[in-house]
């Protein structure tokens, strides 16, 4: 069993078995102390819904790759779930506590994307432009986060990545907006499940270059606060 698990983690074997074009998607999640209680519970429910929705989509399950970056603790950043095809993704159970080092978390996301792009190239696997979803109920607490935000905007302007900043109730949208050239959105209440279902359908359409992709991208009424 140990040998089998080791083989499953070797990316070259993974790409040999599945050479489909990939759509990389990174979730940068604020798991600071203010997310304790119902917010973190609903976030975990949303991640579980994302797992099921992607696995139920035969095409997306083999084309979408996920990575989760957790911002928490004493300005700590953790790769909660490393790059994995959606078909093999298991939603982690997130726990809340500590501060909100969003700058460090977003830089980590950019670095992991660069590394994965190099891996795709070395394996002869094509890929769509990566997506990053930054989700927070507050604002950055780490020193130098403005520099990290500038790196994010630069990467997006140069078409290396698409970044969406999503704020829940209480989030400082003015500061979250600095991480993207796109306007930030605010989640209605704790509608994490509705948001992640939208995300799943959107990345699925993008991964398949579906003609109705823009329809799903633009229709955010189920979770976006007007």
Give short role names for the model-derived ranges:
Residues 1-26, 31-41, 55, 115-125:
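Acidic, polar low-complexity linker/tail segments
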Residues 63-93, 173-179:
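Short beta-strand-loop
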Residues 43-55:
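An active-site-proximal "capping" alpha-helix that borders the catalytic cofactor pocket
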Residues 138-179:
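VWA/integrin I-like adhesion module and closely mimicked acidic/polar interface patches used
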Residues 165, 169-226:
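Von Willebrand factor A/integrin I-like adhesion domains
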Residues 77, 89-128, 162-175, 190-198:
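Von Willebrand factor
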Residues 25-28, 65-72, 129-137, 164-167:
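Extended hydrophobic secondary-structure segments that form protein cores and membrane-embedded regions
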Residues 29-32, 43, 109, 125-142:
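DG-centered beta-turn motif at the end of beta-strands
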């Amino acid at each position: 069993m140990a040998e089998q698990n080791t083989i499953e983690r070797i990316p070259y074997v993974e790409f040999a078995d599945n050479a489909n074009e990939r759509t990389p998607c990174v979730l940068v999640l604020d798991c600071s102390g203010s997310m304790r209680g119902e917010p973190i519970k609903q976030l975990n429910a949303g991640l579980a819904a994302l797992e099921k929705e992607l696995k139920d989509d035969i095409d997306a399950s083999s084309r979408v790759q996920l990575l989760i970056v957790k911002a928490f603790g004493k300005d700590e950043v953790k790769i909660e779930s490393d790059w994995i095809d959606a078909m093999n993704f298991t939603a982690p159970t997130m726990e809340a506590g500590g501060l909100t080092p969003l700058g460090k978390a977003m830089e980590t996301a950019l670095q992991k994307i660069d590394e994965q792009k190099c891996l795709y190239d070395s394996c002869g696997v094509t890929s769509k432009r990566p997506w990053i979803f930054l989700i927070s109920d507050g604002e950055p607490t780490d020193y130098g986060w403005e520099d990290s935000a500038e790196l994010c905007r630069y990467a997006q302007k140069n078409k290396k990545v698409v970044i969406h900043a999503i704020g829940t109730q209480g989030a400082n949208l003015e500061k979250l907006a600095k991480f993207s050239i796109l306007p930030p959105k605010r989640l209605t209440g704790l509608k994490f499940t509705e948001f992640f279902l939208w995300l799943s359908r959107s990345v699925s359409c993008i991964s398949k270059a579906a003609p109705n992709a823009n329809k799903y991208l633009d229709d955010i009424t189920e979770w976006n606060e007007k």
